Structures are given as structure tokens and as C-alpha cells.
């Protein structure tokens, strides 16, 4: 059985703020990005059936499954927003950086604790695992399992020689199409115009995706949250940077 960071435990909730009760990011600082090709050490399942989702979601029902995946979830701001917007859905954040994923795990634990003290049951529908989604996504999800996937402010890998490391490429798009159900959506957001053009070009070239219309984008209740729910998005807003949004439907 695969163990998770929740199972391994951050029960002590150290380095938390006395005011908010939430973990403080200054104790979890790490480089902005991580090399996805490097041989990191991960504990990953051989197949989706081997994942013990109940270790991540205390209230999961027998017929329930993860439907939303935030790939490269960073410090978990958008993941928390998903949990609040869709209390009946299970959302998973996947993050490659160990300290950052530890922070998200501790953040969720603290939010659950605060909610419990108020006789609430919030945030038990979100979780985070440390993994390399570029390598192990099909190990976690069955064919057609996901309803929504999010790629928000991914590493742009500016150097041409590193473009192959970008999380949107033709080979990976086929893997995403495998775990995404027909009619499911892929949300992409970046502040780098070159990366945005790369994403749109590769998604348009793939036969299993179509870009939704600007009207559909504006009517999606998630769209406004994409701009500053995540920590990276909020930083772009503070710096008065540009946002480039593109949403695609699995066909």
C-alpha cells in the first residue's frame, strides 16, 4: 500500500502562526521550481487501485473518487479555494517540491483543525501529495476519472533546450487526455506570454482537445478565481503583471 505525506504525519503542526493557527511559509522556503527530469525519490503506486484515498480524505464515501487535480499546486492557495467552492468534490494538489508539499499538508491539517473547533467539517475534501505528475499521473488516476485539471503558473523553462521539460507537451497531453473524462476541462494560466502561446499551440494541435470560447470562459465560476487565488497569481496581481488564460475541453 502506498503511504502518503498525511500518513507519515505533520501532526505537531510546528512553525504555525499564533494568530492564524496556520503554518508560516518562511519555514518552508524552497527554490521556485524543481527539475522534473531529475531522479527524485518518490513513493508512488503501481496502479490507481493501490492508492489508499481514505488516508487523505477522512470522509470519502465508497463510491467517491478524486475529480479535480491541481498540478503543481504550489503553496495550496487555489486548492483551498477549490475545496471551498466545491464541498462535494474531492480535489488533489500534486507538488514536486518537498518543503512546499509539506507546507500544503500542514496548511490543510491546520484548516481542518480550525474548522473542527467550530463544529465544522470543512477542508476534508482537499489533500496534497508530493509526486512528479509528469511521470506518475496514470499511477494515481483511472481512465476518464478526472473532471478538471489545473495548470496554473507552471515553470516556463525559458531556455530552448529545456522546453522539453514544460508540463504541456504532446506526449504528456495524451496522458492527460487518458485520465480526463470526455467533456472534462483543462485550465491553464501563466504570466509568460511565450509559454501561453506554446500551450495554446500544443493544445490546438492535439486531436483530443478544443479551446472553449471566451464566452464560456467568462461564464465559468472558476475563471475569476484563477487570477489571484494561488500565491503566484496574487503576486502577479500585486506586480501589475499580465495574465494569460486558456481553457480547453477534452473531446
UniProtKB/Swiss-Prot annotation:
It comes from the Eukaryota. It is found in: Nucleus. One of its GO terms (molecular function) is tRNA (guanine(46)-N7)-methyltransferase activity. Its EC number is 2.1.1.33. It catalyses: guanosine(46) in tRNA + S-adenosyl-L-methionine = N(7)-methylguanosine(46) in tRNA + S-adenosyl-L-homocysteine. GO terms for cellular component: nucleus; tRNA methyltransferase complex. Coiled coil: none annotated. InterPro entries: SAM-dependent_MTases_sf, Trm8_euk, tRNA_(Gua-N-7)_MeTrfase_Trmb. Pathway: tRNA modification; N(7)-methylguanine-tRNA biosynthesis. The active site is at residue 155. S-adenosyl-L-methionine binds at residues 72, 95-96, 132-133, 152, 230-232. Pfam families: Methyltransf_4 (PF02390). Its main location: nucleus. Belongs to the class I-like SAM-binding methyltransferase superfamily. TrmB family. Catalyzes the formation of N(7)-methylguanine at position 46 (m7G46) in tRNA. This is tRNA (guanine-N(7)-)-methyltransferase.
Amino acid at each position: 500500500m502506498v503511504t502518503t505525506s498525511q500518513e507519515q504525519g505533520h501532526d505537531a503542526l510546528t512553525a504555525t502562526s499564533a494568530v492564524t493557527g496556520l503554518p508560516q511559509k518562511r519555514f518552508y522556503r524552497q527554490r521556485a521550481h524543481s527539475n522534473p527530469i531529475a531522479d527524485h525519490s518518490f513513493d508512488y503506486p503501481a496502479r490507481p487501485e493501490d492508492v489508499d484515498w481514505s488516508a487523505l480524505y477522512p470522509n470519502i464515501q465508497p463510491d467517491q473518487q478524486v475529480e479535480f487535480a491541481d498540478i503543481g499546486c504550489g503553496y495550496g492557495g487555489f486548492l483551498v479555494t477549490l475545496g471551498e467552492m466545491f464541498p462535494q468534490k474531492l480535489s488533489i494538489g500534486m507538488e514536486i517540491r518537498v518543503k512546499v508539499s509539506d507546507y500544503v499538508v500542514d496548511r490543510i491539517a491546520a484548516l481542518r483543525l480550525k474548522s473542527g473547533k467550530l463544529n465544522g467539517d470543512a477542508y476534508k475534501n482537499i489533500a496534497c501529495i508530493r509526486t512528479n505528475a509528469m511521470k506518475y499521473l496514470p499511477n494515481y488516476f483511472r481512465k476518464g476519472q478526472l473532471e478538471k485539471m489545473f495548470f496554473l503558473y507552471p515553470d516556463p523553462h525559458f531556455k530552448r533546450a529545456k522546453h522539453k521539460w514544460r508540463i504541456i507537451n504532446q506526449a504528456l497531453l495524451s496522458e492527460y487526455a487518458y485520465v480526463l473524462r470526455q467533456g472534462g476541462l483543462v485550465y491553464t494560466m501563466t504570466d509568460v506570454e511565450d509559454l501561453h502561446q506554446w500551450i495554446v499551440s500544443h493544445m490546438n494541435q492535439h486531436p483530443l482537445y478544443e479551446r472553449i470560447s471566451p464566452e464560456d470562459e467568462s461564464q465559468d465560476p472558476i475563471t475569476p478565481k484563477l487570477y489571484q487565488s494561488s500565491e503566484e497569481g496574487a503576486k502577479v496581481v500585486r506586480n501589475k503583471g499580465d495574465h494569460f488564460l486558456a481553457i480547453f475541453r477534452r473531446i
